[in-house]
Design a protein with these regions (language model features):
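C-terminal beta-strand-rich structural cap/linker in extracellular carbohydrate-active enzymes
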Residues: 556-573
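Beta-strand-rich binding/interaction modules
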Residues: 531-551
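Short glycine-biased active-site loop of nucleotidyltransferases that positions the nucleotide triphosphate
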Residues: 59-63, 287-292, 513-514, 560
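Loop/helix patches that line or flank the sugar-binding groove of alpha-linked glycan CAZymes
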Residues: 6-8, 211-250, 260-272, 276, ...
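Acidic/aromatic-lined carbohydrate-recognition and catalytic surfaces
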Residues: 2-188, 192, 204-282, 436, ...
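Extended, hydrophobic alpha-helical segments in both membrane/secreted and soluble proteins
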Residues: 198-203, 365
Length: 573
Protein backbone atom coordinates (compact mmCIF):
# COMPACT_ATOMS: atom_id res chain seq x y z
CA UNK A 1 0.00 0.00 0.00
CA UNK A 2 1.33 3.44 -0.97
CA UNK A 3 2.25 5.66 1.96
CA UNK A 4 1.75 9.35 1.27
CA UNK A 5 3.91 11.98 2.94
CA UNK A 6 2.59 15.03 4.78
CA UNK A 7 3.63 17.37 1.95
CA UNK A 8 1.46 15.36 -0.45
CA UNK A 9 -1.66 15.47 1.71
CA UNK A 10 -1.31 19.01 3.13
CA UNK A 11 -2.93 22.25 2.04
CA UNK A 12 -0.29 25.02 2.15
CA UNK A 13 -1.04 28.63 3.06
CA UNK A 14 1.47 31.31 2.04
CA UNK A 15 2.07 34.07 4.58
CA UNK A 16 3.63 37.29 3.34
CA UNK A 17 4.95 38.40 6.75
CA UNK A 18 5.15 42.12 6.03
CA UNK A 19 1.43 42.18 5.23
CA UNK A 20 -0.16 39.49 7.38
CA UNK A 21 -0.57 40.89 10.91
CA UNK A 22 1.06 43.80 12.77
CA UNK A 23 1.67 42.70 16.34
CA UNK A 24 3.55 45.73 17.66
CA UNK A 25 1.64 48.54 15.98
CA UNK A 26 4.37 49.93 13.73
CA UNK A 27 2.53 49.41 10.43
CA UNK A 28 4.57 46.37 9.40
CA UNK A 29 3.53 42.76 9.81
CA UNK A 30 5.65 40.67 12.16
CA UNK A 31 6.06 37.31 13.86
CA UNK A 32 4.09 38.39 16.94
CA UNK A 33 1.18 39.24 14.68
CA UNK A 34 1.39 35.88 12.93
CA UNK A 35 1.47 34.06 16.27
CA UNK A 36 -1.74 35.82 17.30
CA UNK A 37 -3.44 34.45 14.17
CA UNK A 38 -2.33 30.82 14.34
CA UNK A 39 -5.69 29.72 15.74
CA UNK A 40 -7.39 31.42 12.80
CA UNK A 41 -5.21 29.46 10.38
CA UNK A 42 -5.86 26.19 12.19
CA UNK A 43 -9.62 26.84 12.14
CA UNK A 44 -9.45 27.76 8.46
CA UNK A 45 -8.40 24.20 7.75
CA UNK A 46 -4.92 24.48 6.26
CA UNK A 47 -2.12 22.11 7.23
CA UNK A 48 1.14 23.89 6.44
CA UNK A 49 2.47 27.45 6.29
CA UNK A 50 4.90 28.82 3.73
CA UNK A 51 6.57 31.88 5.24
CA UNK A 52 7.91 34.35 2.68
CA UNK A 53 11.36 35.79 3.51
CA UNK A 54 11.76 36.80 7.14
CA UNK A 55 15.53 37.42 7.01
CA UNK A 56 17.35 40.72 7.60
CA UNK A 57 17.22 42.64 4.34
CA UNK A 58 17.48 46.18 2.98
CA UNK A 59 14.13 45.40 1.32
CA UNK A 60 15.14 46.56 -2.15
CA UNK A 61 13.32 43.51 -3.51
CA UNK A 62 10.87 43.03 -0.65
CA UNK A 63 13.04 40.62 1.32
CA UNK A 64 14.38 38.59 -1.58
CA UNK A 65 17.66 40.48 -1.13
CA UNK A 66 18.95 38.67 1.95
CA UNK A 67 21.62 40.18 4.20
CA UNK A 68 21.81 37.34 6.76
CA UNK A 69 20.57 33.79 6.15
CA UNK A 70 20.42 32.78 9.81
CA UNK A 71 18.74 35.83 11.27
CA UNK A 72 15.35 37.48 11.55
CA UNK A 73 14.62 40.96 10.20
CA UNK A 74 14.40 43.25 13.25
CA UNK A 75 11.09 44.69 12.04
CA UNK A 76 9.66 41.14 12.20
CA UNK A 77 11.06 40.27 15.62
CA UNK A 78 13.89 38.20 17.01
CA UNK A 79 15.14 34.66 16.66
CA UNK A 80 13.35 33.84 19.91
CA UNK A 81 10.14 35.20 18.38
CA UNK A 82 10.67 32.90 15.41
CA UNK A 83 11.15 29.92 17.70
CA UNK A 84 7.92 30.77 19.52
CA UNK A 85 6.11 31.07 16.20
CA UNK A 86 7.48 27.72 15.04
CA UNK A 87 6.57 26.02 18.31
CA UNK A 88 3.09 27.55 18.23
CA UNK A 89 2.51 26.33 14.69
CA UNK A 90 3.72 22.82 15.51
CA UNK A 91 1.56 22.67 18.64
CA UNK A 92 -1.44 23.26 16.38
CA UNK A 93 -0.38 20.61 13.90
CA UNK A 94 0.76 23.16 11.31
CA UNK A 95 3.97 22.50 9.39
CA UNK A 96 6.23 25.43 8.43
CA UNK A 97 8.44 25.85 5.38
CA UNK A 98 10.67 28.87 4.78
CA UNK A 99 11.49 30.80 1.64
CA UNK A 100 15.15 30.23 0.78
CA UNK A 101 16.92 32.50 -1.71
CA UNK A 102 19.89 30.52 -3.00
CA UNK A 103 20.74 32.36 -6.21
CA UNK A 104 21.88 35.69 -4.84
CA UNK A 105 22.35 37.81 -1.74
CA UNK A 106 21.83 41.47 -1.01
CA UNK A 107 24.70 43.71 -2.00
CA UNK A 108 24.76 44.59 1.71
CA UNK A 109 25.41 41.01 2.82
CA UNK A 110 28.78 40.79 4.61
CA UNK A 111 29.91 38.21 2.07
CA UNK A 112 29.49 40.64 -0.81
CA UNK A 113 30.90 43.58 1.15
CA UNK A 114 34.04 41.48 1.65
CA UNK A 115 34.00 40.20 -1.92
CA UNK A 116 34.02 43.67 -3.46
CA UNK A 117 36.66 45.03 -1.07
CA UNK A 118 39.61 43.73 -3.12
CA UNK A 119 40.54 41.22 -5.79
CA UNK A 120 42.53 39.30 -3.20
CA UNK A 121 39.78 38.93 -0.61
CA UNK A 122 39.05 35.27 0.24
CA UNK A 123 35.39 35.86 -0.64
CA UNK A 124 36.13 37.40 -4.03
CA UNK A 125 35.24 34.17 -5.80
CA UNK A 126 32.00 33.78 -3.84
CA UNK A 127 30.42 35.98 -6.51
CA UNK A 128 30.86 36.18 -10.28
CA UNK A 129 33.43 38.86 -11.09
CA UNK A 130 34.85 39.35 -14.57
CA UNK A 131 36.93 41.83 -16.50
CA UNK A 132 35.20 43.82 -19.20
CA UNK A 133 35.84 43.37 -22.91
CA UNK A 134 39.22 44.61 -24.17
CA UNK A 135 37.62 47.57 -25.92
CA UNK A 136 35.41 48.36 -22.96
CA UNK A 137 31.99 47.34 -21.83
CA UNK A 138 30.66 44.36 -19.88
CA UNK A 139 31.96 40.80 -20.36
CA UNK A 140 29.05 39.84 -22.63
CA UNK A 141 25.63 40.98 -23.79
CA UNK A 142 23.53 39.24 -21.14
CA UNK A 143 20.66 41.17 -19.63
CA UNK A 144 19.04 41.25 -16.22
CA UNK A 145 15.50 39.93 -16.06
CA UNK A 146 14.57 43.32 -14.57
CA UNK A 147 16.10 45.28 -17.46
CA UNK A 148 19.52 46.57 -18.45
CA UNK A 149 22.82 44.74 -18.48
CA UNK A 150 23.29 41.77 -16.17
CA UNK A 151 26.73 43.16 -15.34
CA UNK A 152 27.43 46.01 -12.93
CA UNK A 153 30.78 47.78 -13.04
CA UNK A 154 32.60 48.41 -9.76
CA UNK A 155 35.00 51.30 -10.41
CA UNK A 156 36.87 50.78 -7.14
CA UNK A 157 38.19 47.42 -8.34
CA UNK A 158 37.76 47.75 -12.09
CA UNK A 159 35.67 44.61 -12.66
CA UNK A 160 32.04 43.71 -13.30
CA UNK A 161 29.84 41.50 -11.15
CA UNK A 162 26.92 39.47 -12.47
CA UNK A 163 23.30 39.87 -11.33
CA UNK A 164 20.36 38.06 -12.90
CA UNK A 165 17.92 40.25 -10.94
CA UNK A 166 18.52 43.82 -9.70
CA UNK A 167 22.10 45.07 -9.36
CA UNK A 168 21.42 45.14 -5.61
CA UNK A 169 21.16 41.30 -5.80
CA UNK A 170 24.56 39.94 -6.91
CA UNK A 171 24.56 36.28 -7.92
CA UNK A 172 26.48 33.79 -5.83
CA UNK A 173 29.10 31.63 -7.53
CA UNK A 174 27.75 28.13 -6.98
CA UNK A 175 30.81 26.63 -8.68
CA UNK A 176 32.76 27.58 -5.56
CA UNK A 177 32.47 24.75 -2.99
CA UNK A 178 32.75 27.29 -0.17
CA UNK A 179 29.51 28.93 -1.31
CA UNK A 180 27.64 25.63 -1.26
CA UNK A 181 29.07 24.81 2.18
CA UNK A 182 28.03 28.19 3.60
CA UNK A 183 24.52 28.03 2.18
CA UNK A 184 24.06 24.44 3.31
CA UNK A 185 25.14 25.49 6.81
CA UNK A 186 22.26 27.98 6.77
CA UNK A 187 19.92 25.20 5.69
CA UNK A 188 21.10 23.05 8.59
CA UNK A 189 20.60 25.96 10.98
CA UNK A 190 16.87 26.11 10.23
CA UNK A 191 16.41 22.35 9.95
CA UNK A 192 18.05 21.90 13.36
CA UNK A 193 15.58 24.44 14.71
CA UNK A 194 12.73 22.28 13.43
CA UNK A 195 11.43 23.88 10.22
CA UNK A 196 9.74 21.38 7.94
CA UNK A 197 11.34 22.38 4.67
CA UNK A 198 11.95 25.14 2.18
CA UNK A 199 10.45 26.81 -0.85
CA UNK A 200 13.47 27.46 -3.07
CA UNK A 201 13.26 30.81 -4.82
CA UNK A 202 14.29 31.19 -8.49
CA UNK A 203 16.00 27.82 -8.40
CA UNK A 204 16.68 27.62 -12.13
CA UNK A 205 19.05 30.60 -12.06
CA UNK A 206 21.82 29.15 -9.85
CA UNK A 207 24.25 28.58 -12.71
CA UNK A 208 25.26 30.37 -15.89
CA UNK A 209 27.06 29.01 -18.93
CA UNK A 210 30.69 28.76 -17.74
CA UNK A 211 32.15 30.26 -20.94
CA UNK A 212 29.91 33.34 -20.68
CA UNK A 213 29.21 33.41 -24.43
CA UNK A 214 27.29 36.26 -26.00
CA UNK A 215 23.63 35.38 -26.44
CA UNK A 216 22.44 35.41 -30.07
CA UNK A 217 18.98 36.32 -28.79
CA UNK A 218 19.97 38.89 -26.19
CA UNK A 219 17.29 41.56 -26.13
CA UNK A 220 17.67 45.27 -25.94
CA UNK A 221 16.04 46.78 -22.84
CA UNK A 222 13.13 47.75 -25.09
CA UNK A 223 12.78 44.17 -26.41
CA UNK A 224 12.82 42.77 -22.88
CA UNK A 225 10.23 45.21 -21.63
CA UNK A 226 7.95 44.62 -24.61
CA UNK A 227 8.10 40.85 -24.03
CA UNK A 228 7.30 41.36 -20.36
CA UNK A 229 4.54 43.85 -21.20
CA UNK A 230 3.00 41.39 -23.69
CA UNK A 231 2.98 38.72 -21.00
CA UNK A 232 1.19 40.74 -18.36
CA UNK A 233 -1.30 42.21 -20.84
CA UNK A 234 -1.95 38.80 -22.46
CA UNK A 235 -1.53 40.26 -25.95
CA UNK A 236 0.22 37.06 -27.03
CA UNK A 237 -0.19 33.43 -25.95
CA UNK A 238 1.74 32.57 -22.81
CA UNK A 239 3.69 29.80 -24.52
CA UNK A 240 4.89 32.19 -27.26
CA UNK A 241 6.15 34.72 -24.73
CA UNK A 242 7.71 31.98 -22.61
CA UNK A 243 9.63 30.62 -25.61
CA UNK A 244 10.88 34.11 -26.46
CA UNK A 245 12.07 34.75 -22.91
CA UNK A 246 13.71 31.31 -22.76
CA UNK A 247 15.74 32.18 -25.86
CA UNK A 248 16.71 35.55 -24.40
CA UNK A 249 18.10 33.93 -21.25
CA UNK A 250 19.29 30.63 -22.73
CA UNK A 251 22.77 30.88 -21.13
CA UNK A 252 21.54 32.23 -17.80
CA UNK A 253 18.88 29.77 -16.61
CA UNK A 254 18.36 26.02 -16.29
CA UNK A 255 22.03 25.13 -16.71
CA UNK A 256 23.12 21.53 -15.92
CA UNK A 257 24.84 22.39 -12.64
CA UNK A 258 21.53 23.11 -10.93
CA UNK A 259 20.70 19.41 -10.73
CA UNK A 260 23.91 18.59 -8.86
CA UNK A 261 23.18 21.23 -6.23
CA UNK A 262 19.62 20.00 -5.81
CA UNK A 263 20.77 16.41 -5.38
CA UNK A 264 23.23 17.50 -2.71
CA UNK A 265 20.58 19.62 -1.01
CA UNK A 266 18.07 16.77 -1.12
CA UNK A 267 20.64 14.45 0.46
CA UNK A 268 21.14 16.98 3.25
CA UNK A 269 17.41 17.43 3.83
CA UNK A 270 16.89 13.66 3.82
CA UNK A 271 19.22 13.40 6.82
CA UNK A 272 16.31 14.91 8.77
CA UNK A 273 12.99 13.24 9.36
CA UNK A 274 10.19 14.04 6.94
CA UNK A 275 11.23 17.40 5.47
CA UNK A 276 10.33 18.79 2.04
CA UNK A 277 11.76 20.93 -0.77
CA UNK A 278 9.45 22.97 -3.00
CA UNK A 279 10.92 24.71 -6.04
CA UNK A 280 9.80 27.99 -7.57
CA UNK A 281 9.75 26.42 -11.01
CA UNK A 282 7.35 24.50 -13.18
CA UNK A 283 10.14 22.44 -14.75
CA UNK A 284 9.42 18.80 -13.94
CA UNK A 285 13.06 17.94 -14.67
CA UNK A 286 13.90 19.32 -11.22
CA UNK A 287 12.23 16.30 -9.64
CA UNK A 288 15.33 14.42 -10.82
CA UNK A 289 14.44 10.74 -10.80
CA UNK A 290 11.42 11.58 -8.66
CA UNK A 291 13.15 10.95 -5.36
CA UNK A 292 16.53 12.69 -5.48
CA UNK A 293 15.88 16.40 -6.16
CA UNK A 294 12.76 18.48 -5.39
CA UNK A 295 9.71 17.00 -3.70
CA UNK A 296 7.36 19.50 -5.36
CA UNK A 297 7.40 21.94 -8.25
CA UNK A 298 4.58 24.34 -9.00
CA UNK A 299 2.00 23.83 -11.70
CA UNK A 300 2.42 27.43 -12.85
CA UNK A 301 0.91 26.76 -16.30
CA UNK A 302 -2.47 26.35 -14.59
CA UNK A 303 -2.55 30.07 -13.74
CA UNK A 304 -1.35 31.30 -17.15
CA UNK A 305 -4.76 32.05 -18.55
CA UNK A 306 -7.04 35.05 -18.32
CA UNK A 307 -10.12 32.89 -17.82
CA UNK A 308 -10.35 29.45 -16.26
CA UNK A 309 -12.22 27.11 -18.58
CA UNK A 310 -12.87 23.36 -18.60
CA UNK A 311 -10.76 22.96 -21.74
CA UNK A 312 -7.83 24.80 -20.14
CA UNK A 313 -7.98 22.73 -16.97
CA UNK A 314 -8.26 19.44 -18.90
CA UNK A 315 -5.32 20.24 -21.13
CA UNK A 316 -3.24 21.30 -18.15
CA UNK A 317 -3.95 18.11 -16.23
CA UNK A 318 -3.31 15.87 -19.22
CA UNK A 319 0.06 17.50 -19.88
CA UNK A 320 1.26 17.81 -16.28
CA UNK A 321 0.25 14.36 -15.08
CA UNK A 322 1.68 12.68 -18.18
CA UNK A 323 4.96 14.53 -17.69
CA UNK A 324 5.10 13.60 -14.01
CA UNK A 325 4.39 9.97 -14.75
CA UNK A 326 7.22 9.99 -17.26
CA UNK A 327 9.59 10.90 -14.43
CA UNK A 328 8.29 8.21 -12.13
CA UNK A 329 4.78 6.99 -11.31
CA UNK A 330 4.97 7.95 -7.65
CA UNK A 331 8.04 9.96 -6.67
CA UNK A 332 6.93 13.16 -8.42
CA UNK A 333 3.85 15.00 -7.21
CA UNK A 334 2.01 18.09 -8.50
CA UNK A 335 1.85 21.39 -6.65
CA UNK A 336 -1.24 23.34 -7.70
CA UNK A 337 -1.72 27.07 -7.24
CA UNK A 338 -3.52 29.99 -8.82
CA UNK A 339 -1.99 32.85 -6.84
CA UNK A 340 0.99 34.11 -4.87
CA UNK A 341 2.86 37.31 -3.97
CA UNK A 342 4.11 37.88 -7.54
CA UNK A 343 0.91 37.67 -9.58
CA UNK A 344 -2.54 39.29 -9.55
CA UNK A 345 -4.86 38.12 -6.82
CA UNK A 346 -7.18 35.30 -7.82
CA UNK A 347 -10.31 37.39 -7.33
CA UNK A 348 -8.98 40.07 -9.70
CA UNK A 349 -7.16 37.81 -12.16
CA UNK A 350 -10.06 35.52 -13.00
CA UNK A 351 -12.89 37.96 -12.37
CA UNK A 352 -14.39 40.39 -14.85
CA UNK A 353 -15.57 43.18 -12.56
CA UNK A 354 -19.08 41.86 -11.99
CA UNK A 355 -19.38 41.27 -8.24
CA UNK A 356 -21.62 38.19 -8.37
CA UNK A 357 -19.65 36.50 -11.16
CA UNK A 358 -16.32 37.36 -9.55
CA UNK A 359 -17.42 35.77 -6.29
CA UNK A 360 -18.58 32.64 -8.12
CA UNK A 361 -15.33 32.42 -10.10
CA UNK A 362 -13.28 32.85 -6.92
CA UNK A 363 -15.13 29.90 -5.42
CA UNK A 364 -14.57 27.85 -8.57
CA UNK A 365 -10.86 28.65 -8.54
CA UNK A 366 -10.55 27.32 -5.01
CA UNK A 367 -12.58 24.22 -5.87
CA UNK A 368 -10.29 23.55 -8.83
CA UNK A 369 -7.15 23.95 -6.70
CA UNK A 370 -8.47 21.68 -3.94
CA UNK A 371 -9.90 18.90 -6.12
CA UNK A 372 -7.20 18.40 -8.75
CA UNK A 373 -4.57 15.77 -8.01
CA UNK A 374 -1.72 17.34 -6.09
CA UNK A 375 -0.84 19.61 -3.19
CA UNK A 376 -2.77 22.92 -3.08
CA UNK A 377 -1.07 26.22 -2.28
CA UNK A 378 -3.20 29.19 -1.17
CA UNK A 379 -2.11 32.80 -0.68
CA UNK A 380 -3.09 34.86 2.35
CA UNK A 381 -6.20 36.94 1.71
CA UNK A 382 -7.62 34.71 -1.02
CA UNK A 383 -10.04 33.25 1.50
CA UNK A 384 -11.84 36.58 1.94
CA UNK A 385 -11.67 37.63 -1.71
CA UNK A 386 -8.98 40.29 -1.36
CA UNK A 387 -8.50 42.12 -4.64
CA UNK A 388 -5.63 43.92 -6.30
CA UNK A 389 -5.28 47.50 -5.09
CA UNK A 390 -3.80 49.97 -7.56
CA UNK A 391 -1.55 52.61 -6.02
CA UNK A 392 -2.04 56.13 -7.35
CA UNK A 393 1.27 57.67 -6.27
CA UNK A 394 4.72 56.41 -7.27
CA UNK A 395 5.98 57.44 -3.83
CA UNK A 396 3.77 54.71 -2.34
CA UNK A 397 5.40 51.97 -4.44
CA UNK A 398 7.53 49.52 -2.48
CA UNK A 399 8.10 47.13 -5.39
CA UNK A 400 11.02 48.37 -7.47
CA UNK A 401 9.81 46.25 -10.37
CA UNK A 402 6.80 48.57 -10.52
CA UNK A 403 9.08 51.61 -10.42
CA UNK A 404 11.11 50.17 -13.31
CA UNK A 405 7.91 49.44 -15.24
CA UNK A 406 6.78 53.04 -14.88
CA UNK A 407 10.09 54.38 -16.14
CA UNK A 408 10.23 51.83 -18.98
CA UNK A 409 6.74 52.66 -20.22
CA UNK A 410 7.68 56.32 -20.47
CA UNK A 411 11.00 55.55 -22.18
CA UNK A 412 10.10 52.65 -24.47
CA UNK A 413 6.36 52.94 -25.08
CA UNK A 414 6.23 56.75 -24.85
CA UNK A 415 3.36 56.73 -22.37
CA UNK A 416 2.39 59.97 -20.66
CA UNK A 417 3.54 59.92 -17.01
CA UNK A 418 -0.04 59.61 -15.72
CA UNK A 419 -0.77 56.61 -17.94
CA UNK A 420 2.62 55.05 -17.15
CA UNK A 421 1.85 55.30 -13.44
CA UNK A 422 -1.55 53.68 -13.92
CA UNK A 423 -0.07 50.85 -15.99
CA UNK A 424 2.84 50.36 -13.57
CA UNK A 425 0.43 49.95 -10.67
CA UNK A 426 -1.27 47.19 -12.65
CA UNK A 427 1.99 45.54 -13.75
CA UNK A 428 3.87 45.75 -10.45
CA UNK A 429 3.50 43.47 -7.44
CA UNK A 430 2.48 45.91 -4.71
CA UNK A 431 -1.14 45.45 -5.77
CA UNK A 432 -1.28 41.89 -4.42
CA UNK A 433 0.81 42.51 -1.29
CA UNK A 434 -1.37 45.00 0.60
CA UNK A 435 -2.10 44.36 4.30
CA UNK A 436 -4.41 41.54 5.31
CA UNK A 437 -7.93 42.76 6.04
CA UNK A 438 -8.98 41.44 9.44
CA UNK A 439 -11.96 43.63 10.34
CA UNK A 440 -14.15 46.58 9.41
CA UNK A 441 -11.98 48.83 11.55
CA UNK A 442 -9.26 51.44 11.01
CA UNK A 443 -6.48 49.99 8.87
CA UNK A 444 -8.70 46.91 8.41
CA UNK A 445 -7.57 45.70 11.84
CA UNK A 446 -4.07 45.09 10.50
CA UNK A 447 -2.55 47.98 12.48
CA UNK A 448 -3.99 50.32 15.11
CA UNK A 449 -5.84 53.46 14.07
CA UNK A 450 -3.58 56.35 13.12
CA UNK A 451 -0.63 54.16 12.11
CA UNK A 452 0.70 54.45 8.56
CA UNK A 453 0.93 50.93 7.15
CA UNK A 454 3.89 49.92 5.00
CA UNK A 455 1.57 49.71 1.99
CA UNK A 456 -1.85 51.36 1.89
CA UNK A 457 -4.78 49.21 2.98
CA UNK A 458 -7.35 48.39 0.31
CA UNK A 459 -10.46 50.37 1.35
CA UNK A 460 -12.81 47.57 0.32
CA UNK A 461 -12.39 46.12 3.81
CA UNK A 462 -15.33 48.39 4.65
CA UNK A 463 -17.47 46.66 2.00
CA UNK A 464 -17.26 43.25 3.64
CA UNK A 465 -13.85 42.10 2.45
CA UNK A 466 -12.57 41.32 5.92
CA UNK A 467 -12.24 38.29 8.18
CA UNK A 468 -14.44 39.31 11.11
CA UNK A 469 -17.40 40.25 8.96
CA UNK A 470 -17.23 37.11 6.86
CA UNK A 471 -16.88 34.80 9.84
CA UNK A 472 -20.30 36.06 10.96
CA UNK A 473 -21.92 35.37 7.58
CA UNK A 474 -22.61 31.67 6.88
CA UNK A 475 -22.66 32.16 3.09
CA UNK A 476 -19.47 34.24 2.92
CA UNK A 477 -16.45 33.35 0.83
CA UNK A 478 -14.43 32.70 3.99
CA UNK A 479 -16.94 30.19 5.33
CA UNK A 480 -17.08 28.62 1.87
CA UNK A 481 -13.30 28.11 2.09
CA UNK A 482 -13.66 26.53 5.51
CA UNK A 483 -16.42 24.17 4.32
CA UNK A 484 -14.55 23.08 1.21
CA UNK A 485 -11.27 22.59 3.06
CA UNK A 486 -13.15 20.44 5.58
CA UNK A 487 -14.74 18.41 2.77
CA UNK A 488 -11.31 17.77 1.26
CA UNK A 489 -9.84 16.76 4.61
CA UNK A 490 -12.65 14.22 5.11
CA UNK A 491 -12.38 12.72 1.59
CA UNK A 492 -9.34 10.47 1.09
CA UNK A 493 -9.85 10.27 -2.67
CA UNK A 494 -9.64 14.05 -3.03
CA UNK A 495 -6.30 14.02 -1.23
CA UNK A 496 -4.47 11.08 -2.77
CA UNK A 497 -6.71 9.61 -5.46
CA UNK A 498 -6.05 9.26 -9.16
CA UNK A 499 -7.50 11.80 -11.60
CA UNK A 500 -9.85 10.36 -14.24
CA UNK A 501 -11.35 12.88 -16.71
CA UNK A 502 -14.99 12.55 -17.79
CA UNK A 503 -16.98 14.22 -20.58
CA UNK A 504 -13.83 15.61 -22.15
CA UNK A 505 -15.67 17.50 -24.89
CA UNK A 506 -17.98 19.43 -22.57
CA UNK A 507 -17.33 23.15 -23.16
CA UNK A 508 -18.97 24.58 -20.04
CA UNK A 509 -18.25 22.21 -17.19
CA UNK A 510 -15.35 20.14 -15.92
CA UNK A 511 -16.11 16.63 -14.67
CA UNK A 512 -13.70 14.06 -13.32
CA UNK A 513 -13.30 11.25 -10.82
CA UNK A 514 -10.82 11.16 -7.97
CA UNK A 515 -10.39 7.60 -6.75
CA UNK A 516 -8.26 5.50 -4.47
CA UNK A 517 -8.71 2.14 -2.79
CA UNK A 518 -11.01 3.61 -0.14
CA UNK A 519 -13.23 5.94 -2.11
CA UNK A 520 -14.31 7.27 -5.50
CA UNK A 521 -15.47 10.88 -5.78
CA UNK A 522 -17.23 12.59 -8.65
CA UNK A 523 -16.34 16.27 -9.09
CA UNK A 524 -18.29 18.59 -11.38
CA UNK A 525 -17.40 22.27 -11.74
CA UNK A 526 -19.79 24.36 -13.83
CA UNK A 527 -17.70 27.28 -15.06
CA UNK A 528 -20.51 29.18 -16.76
CA UNK A 529 -23.61 31.08 -15.76
CA UNK A 530 -26.15 28.69 -17.19
CA UNK A 531 -27.63 25.51 -15.82
CA UNK A 532 -26.81 22.08 -17.23
CA UNK A 533 -28.34 18.64 -17.05
CA UNK A 534 -25.72 15.93 -17.43
CA UNK A 535 -25.89 12.16 -17.78
CA UNK A 536 -23.04 10.09 -16.36
CA UNK A 537 -22.39 6.53 -17.50
CA UNK A 538 -20.89 5.19 -14.28
CA UNK A 539 -21.01 1.75 -12.62
CA UNK A 540 -23.40 3.10 -10.00
CA UNK A 541 -26.29 5.54 -10.08
CA UNK A 542 -26.11 6.24 -6.34
CA UNK A 543 -24.03 8.97 -4.74
CA UNK A 544 -23.61 10.56 -1.35
CA UNK A 545 -23.28 14.32 -1.51
CA UNK A 546 -20.04 15.55 0.06
CA UNK A 547 -20.16 19.19 -0.97
CA UNK A 548 -22.19 21.55 -3.10
CA UNK A 549 -22.17 25.29 -3.51
CA UNK A 550 -25.97 25.12 -3.92
CA UNK A 551 -28.83 23.46 -2.07
CA UNK A 552 -29.55 20.00 -3.50
CA UNK A 553 -31.81 17.05 -2.93
CA UNK A 554 -31.10 13.37 -3.56
CA UNK A 555 -29.16 12.68 -6.76
CA UNK A 556 -29.45 10.10 -9.51
CA UNK A 557 -26.15 9.97 -11.41
CA UNK A 558 -27.91 8.95 -14.60
CA UNK A 559 -29.27 12.49 -14.81
CA UNK A 560 -27.80 15.36 -12.79
CA UNK A 561 -28.76 19.01 -13.00
CA UNK A 562 -26.29 21.74 -12.11
CA UNK A 563 -26.99 25.37 -11.33
CA UNK A 564 -24.90 28.17 -12.86
CA UNK A 565 -21.36 28.15 -11.41
CA UNK A 566 -22.18 25.15 -9.22
CA UNK A 567 -19.49 23.12 -7.48
CA UNK A 568 -20.51 19.53 -6.87
CA UNK A 569 -18.60 16.75 -5.10
CA UNK A 570 -20.14 13.36 -4.34
CA UNK A 571 -18.94 9.96 -3.22
CA UNK A 572 -20.02 7.08 -5.43
CA UNK A 573 -21.74 4.37 -3.42
Amino acid sequence: MTHFKWWQTAVFYQIYPRSFADGNGDGIGDLTGIMARLDYLKDLGVDALWLSPHYPSPQFDCGYDVADYTGVAPEYGTLDDFKRFLDGAHQRGLRVILDLVLNHTSDQHPWFVASRSSRDNPKRDWYIWRDGKPRGGPPNNWVSTFGGSAWEYDPAIGQYYYHYFFKQQPDLNWRNPAVQAAMFNAVRFWLDMGVDGFRLDAIGTLFEHPALPDSPAAPTPRDLFQAWHSGVTATEPAEVIEARLKAMFQYQVDQPGVHGVLRALRALVDEYDDRALVGETDDIAYHGNGNDELHLVFNFPLMRTRRLTPAWARANQAARLAALNAVTPFGAWPGNTLGNHDVPRVYSHFGDGDASRDDALARLSLALTLTLRGTPFLYNGEEIGMTDFMLADLRQFRDNLGVWACQAMIEFLHFAPEEALKQAAQRGRDKCRTPMQWADAPNAGFSPAGVETWLPVNPNYAQGVNVAGQLAQPASLLNFYRRLLRARRNSPALITGDYVPLHEDAPDYLAFLRRNAAQTCLVVLNFFERAHTVKFDLPTRAARLLFSSHERGADDLSRLSFAPFEIYIAELT
